[in-house]
Swiss-Prot record:
GO cellular component, one term: cytoplasm
Job description of the protein: Catalyzes the NADPH-dependent reduction of N-acetyl-5-glutamyl phosphate to yield N-acetyl-L-glutamate 5-semialdehyde.
Cellular compartments annotated: Cytoplasm
Native organism taxonomy: Bacteria, Bacillati, Bacillota, Clostridia, Eubacteriales
Protein's name according to its UniProt entry: N-acetyl-gamma-glutamyl-phosphate reductase
GO molecular function per UniProt: N-acetyl-gamma-glutamyl-phosphate reductase activity; NAD binding; NADP+ binding
Record organism: Clostridium novyi (strain NT)
GO biological process: L-arginine biosynthetic process
């Protein structure tokens, strides 16, 4: 059995990790930690776990005494909060999957520019592995620290990677228009997340300065060995969970829709969790699953390729992708514990 600990277990992503790891046939949950609910039973925070998870959440001081009992620790904390425990865990030889943005950007100056805090573990950035399994499976197998991708970044990179790697589009023409459910804002109390503030409305935010922008650019640039700059605009929509990314770029090769679909199908032919659909995609078809559904189209009038990509932000955009990474890291079938169809209603 893989012995795991979860730090930050009572946030939306943390509780999703608990759900997935509880039903995983190869996992034993050794401890759950929470900054806000230390000393409380996990199922008193989330009543749906009564009878299933009886664990009491522990504080960080106690975590340090329990780390020796685990093989891997999941960090489900906001950015800037995981540095101490990542360093502590790595020094003990424990594998780490970090779900914050703290180790995604390889350039510490870029991190400091976008996240507005100094990076105290610059040396660790050299060997952190970007945990997007469909694209970096070989690196993940050898990792000691996996930085789980952001939700917007996951949907966008998966949608655009074939276009970049196959050199099908003008690199400077990429636009990503993305929508997220409200759970993407986290569980902490924020005015903009209150029901009356976010229901029956839509709004753009982070225009020109969203932190997933450099993450998307960095990973796409790896495929063409040149710096890609793109336009990324996220929006908040009144649904609980889900990401819908619509990606646009100018074609530089003479392709029709059928040829483009075939190129995508071949690119992802060995990736179980990627579905290239003939139909237009919808968020509800991937809800509560680890799947990424995408649809490709060409606007012949403007010579634009349009790729629509949908994921569940708490699953493929966070927790289930982290479990997929763990499976790869420990050499088990990456579908283990994740072969779950969407619950569309």
């Amino acid at each position: 059995m893989i012995k795991v600990g979860i730090i930050g277990s009572t946030g939306y992503i943390g509780q999703q990790l608990v759900w997935l790891l509880k039903i995983h046939p190869n996992v034993e949950i050794v401890f759950l930690s929470s900054y806000n609910y230390a000393g409380y039973s996990f199922n008193s925070v989330y009543n749906n776990y009564k009878g299933f998870v009886e664990t009491t959440c522990i504080n960080i001081k106690e975590v340090k005494t329990r780390l020796k009992d685990v093989d891997i620790v999941f960090m489900a904390l906001p950015h800037g909060k995981s540095f101490e425990m990542v360093k502590y865990s790595l020094n003990l030889g424990i594998k780490v999957i970090d779900l914050s943005g703290d180790f995604r950007l390889k350039d510490s100056k870029e991190y400091e520019k976008w996240y507005k805090i100094e990076h105290p573990l610059k040396e660790v950035l050299k060997y952190s592995v970007y945990g997007l399994p469909e694209l970096f499976r070989k690196d993940i197998k050898k990792a000691s620290l996996i930085c789980n991708p952001g939700c917007y970044a996951t949907a966008s990179i998966l949608a655009l990677a074939p276009l970049i790697k196959l050199d099908l589009v003008e690199k400077g023409s990429i636009i990503v228009d993305a929508k997220s459910g409200v759970s993407g804002a986290g569980r902490a109390l924020k005015t903009q997340s209150l029901y009356c503030e976010c229901n029956e409305t839509m709004k753009a935010y982070g225009i020109g300065n969203h932190r997933h922008t450099p993450e998307i650019e960095q990973e796409l640039s790896r495929f063409c060995k040149e710096d890609i700059k793109l336009t990324f605009t996220p929006h908040l929509v009144p649904i609980n969970r889900g990401i819908f990314a619509t990606c646009y770029a100018t074609l530089k090769k003479d392709l029709n829709k059928v040829q483009l679909e075939e190129a995508y199908e071949k690119f992802y032919e060995n990736d179980y969790f990627i579905k290239v659909m003939k139909e237009l995609v919808e968020v509800k078809w991937i809800k509560n699953s680890n799947f990424c559904n995408m649809n490709v189209n060409i606007d012949e009038r403007t010579n634009k390729v349009i790729v629509s990509s949908v994921i569940d932000n708490l699953m493929k955009g966070a927790a289930s992708q982290a479990v997929q990474n763990m499976n790869i890291l420990f050499g088990i079938d990456e579908k283990t514990g994740l072969n779950i169809p969407s619950m569309m209603i």
